[in-house]
């Protein structure tokens, strides 16, 4: 997002003249612990004005990525709990009902009557 010709972002106004750089002050600011920065502007000056903004805006680093919840994902899984046990029992009953066992332990399949 580039700002238009108008001042539509909340940056402090830039001086037209060159400012004298104080390296000690820059190093002190650099080594300070990261603090919350509420600057919403994405211009070049605001992206590089502090270490936190540089990491967030310049490099795109996010330490707390919040997942978007998809509606309906908290539904019960149909294969869990008592339903799965009931299905397993029903399936095993249907398997054994279609077979007959002989005295020597062999199984034979029953044939369905066709009309």
Swiss-Prot record:
This is Protein Tat. Interacts with host CCNT1. Associates with the P-TEFb complex composed at least of Tat, P-TEFb (CDK9 and CCNT1), TAR RNA, RNA Pol II. Interacts with CCNT2; the resulting complex is unable to bind to TAR RNA. Belongs to the lentiviruses Tat family. It is found in: Host nucleus, Host nucleolus. GO terms for biological process: positive regulation of viral transcription. Residues 54-64 are annotated as: Core. InterPro entries: IV_Tat (IPR001831), Tat_dom_sf (IPR036963). The gene is tat. GO terms for cellular component: host cell nucleolus. One of its GO terms (molecular function) is RNA-binding transcription regulator activity. It comes from Simian immunodeficiency virus (isolate GB1) (SIV-mnd). It comes from the Viruses. Keywords: Activator, Host nucleus, Host-virus interaction, RNA-binding, Transcription, Transcription regulation. Residues 37-53 are annotated as: Cysteine-rich. Transcriptional activator that increases RNA Pol II processivity, thereby increasing the level of full-length viral transcripts. Recognizes a hairpin structure at the 5'-LTR of the nascent viral mRNAs referred to as the transactivation responsive RNA element (TAR) and recruits the cyclin T1-CDK9 complex (P-TEFb complex) that will in turn hyperphosphorylate the RNA polymerase II to allow efficient elongation. The CDK9 component of P-TEFb and other Tat-activated kinases hyperphosphorylate the C-terminus of RNA Pol II that becomes stabilized and much more processive.
């Amino acid at each position: 997002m580039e700002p238009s010709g108008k001042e539509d972002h909340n940056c402090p106004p830039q001086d037209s003249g060159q400012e004298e750089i104080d390296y000690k002050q820059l190093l002190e600011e650099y080594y300070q612990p990261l603090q919350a920065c509420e600057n919403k502007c994405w211009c070049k000056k605001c992206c590089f004005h502090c270490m936190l903004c540089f990491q967030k805006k310049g490099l795109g680093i996010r330490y707390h990525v919040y997942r978007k919840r998809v509606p309906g994902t908290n539904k019960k899984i149909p294969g869990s709990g008592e339903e799965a046990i009931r299905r397993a029992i029903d399936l095993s009953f249907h398997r054994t009902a279609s077979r007959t066992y002989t005295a020597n332990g062999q199984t034979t399949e029953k044939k369905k009557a066709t009309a």
